[in-house]
Design a protein with these regions (language model features):
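N-terminal nucleophile
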Residues: 1-153
Length: 153
């Protein structure tokens, strides 16, 4: 593992309802640099920190140019049902976006982009949450979806 890249993760959730995930942004190697900061800490920084969703993403956006391309999705689920989810991409848009309720998809481009695999995943996810009646089945089905390697063209 390269120095400065250890200890990171791409997805995480805490028992208090905080969660985060990051993806790299798919781009030509000519637009990346080996001198960029590692992105692995982006998820754990949110999970370990005290900032709310929007403030955390604003802080990350202030340093966005120091990294190769990435998406960062962070959120908080509260016991009263209020959910706050935000997204930031350091390549396109470069604005912190607070998400409205609904199903959103994220891969290696922008949020809700129109890649075939995104449409496929969104439809599968919607069907799973509509048709699943127990927590165990929901978890099993969602894990199966994450493992799905079906080629969609």
């Amino acid at each position: 593992m390269k120095s400065g890249r250890e200890g990171g993760t791409w997805i995480g959730m805490k028992s208090d309802g905080k969660f985060a995930a990051t993806t790299f942004y798919r781009q030509s190697k000519k637009f990346t640099t080996s001198k960029a900061k590692g992105r692995g800490h982006l998820v754990s920084d949110f999970l370990k920190g005290d900032d709310d969703v929007e403030n955390h993403l604003k802080k990350v956006s202030n340093e966005g140019d120091l990294y190769n391309g990435f998406n960062l999705l962070v959120g908080e689920l509260s016991p009263n049902g209020e959910t706050k989810v935000g997204w930031y991409c350091n390549i396109e848009d470069k604005q912190v976006t607070m998400l409205k309720p609904g199903i959103h998809v994220l891969s290696n481009k922008t949020l809700n982009c129109s890649w075939p695999k995104m449409g496929y995943g969104k439809k599968r996810f919607a069907r799973i949450i509509e048709e699943t009646s127990t927590k165990k089945d929901l978890v099993d089905e969602l894990l199966w979806l994450l493992k799905d390697r079906k080629s969609v063209v």
